[in-house]
């Protein structure tokens, strides 16, 4: 039996390795994801499409988990995101700028699977870093 913090750790390992091939091992098939960049997905395939879009824009994206708090089926994580803006991200063309911004994620776990993810990132900071020079 895996504990909730370890499951969330596997989620961030998946992001940092850029390998989502084992997503079904940690996500429920009806995963609901709400990202601070305005994206809502339902299901593993939609989440993978979102991840592919983000990684096309920031191919070396890294999630540094700084604080992890577990309360029952909920896990809250304070994260610093970093990488290089190499591709188009929404309306922002590639700038080759290094980015670093913080956020918080709130994950719900049921039956040893992540069922819901809500991300609140500092969009203002991110957008200021990826505006054209």
Q: Where are the regions that the model predicts?
A:
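C-terminal and inter-domain tail/linker signature
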Residues: 1-133
